[in-house]
Amino acid sequence: MITKRIIPCLDVRDGRVVKGVNFADLHDVSSPVELAEYYSRAGADELVFYDITASAEGRALFTDILTETARRVFIPLTVGGGINSLADFDRVLKCGADKVSVNSGAIRRPALVGEAARRYGDQCVVLSVDVKRVGGAFRVFARGGRDDTGLEAIEWIRRCVGEGAGEVVVNSIDTDGVKRGFDLEMLDAVCRAVSVPVIASGGAGCIDDFLTLFRAQPRVDAGLAASIFHFGEVRIDDLKDAMARAGIPVRIVAAAQAERSETCSTSTN
């Protein structure tokens, strides 16, 4: 049985991890390299790095941070932000990324998805979609959630998967940072439309939100979150223990268990 993945998301601006609500009101959190190392030890299955202002500012994605992170962690890295060409794919992959996430770049030039899939393989191409309800419809937003593209989200996702995207990260702007649970209705629509792995993003506030996600939408492959992990509201090992007890298939990392045991031992001495 395929295990469900737990993926911390590191939104990076000016070399620091930040987090806000509804894609706005951003606050400084930590060093991305140090935070990535922590999550690697804590049992995260993968990491997602987004340079959240690269597209809006029309500049290249951070590569120095990525290179240093790839040297220190040994779990898969997905990296996005400012990906507009095959040259951007090349640069990010050479710096140590395992997968490349494309969002606004695909909206500007949809052929990029197919070109990248043919060159690197569809397993390397992750479609990231920022979705918000507008007039009852799911609409695609670009430039870090700033611009309404007018694209209908489910059709856009179906189109890009048809071009070769091997995985989809669905970012709910409506629930981002709100901590009231994932957007199950939207995720259901996406899972019905495509057969590639779907990663749910936006809305996690507690362990029960992940349990509800995987029970209600068993076709969702992974849950992605930021602030609840960054601020210690949910520990990844505690989350995975709860998932295992609930019968949800999950990878338990021995290193994370050992670190927790050592912490507990220290606290009782």
Language-model regions, residue ranges each:
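Structural preference for beta-strand elements that scaffold enzyme active sites
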Residues: 5-9, 46, 74-78, 99-101, ...
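Conserved, mostly hydrophobic/aromatic
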Residues: 11, 39, 47, 79, ...
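Glycine-rich, proline-tolerant flexible connector loops at the mouths of alpha/beta enzymes
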Residues: 46-64, 104, 169-181
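Catalytic cores of alpha/beta
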Residues: 73, 77-99, 185-222
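C-terminal helical cap(s) of enzyme catalytic domains, especially alpha/beta-barrels
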Residues: 113-120, 214-254
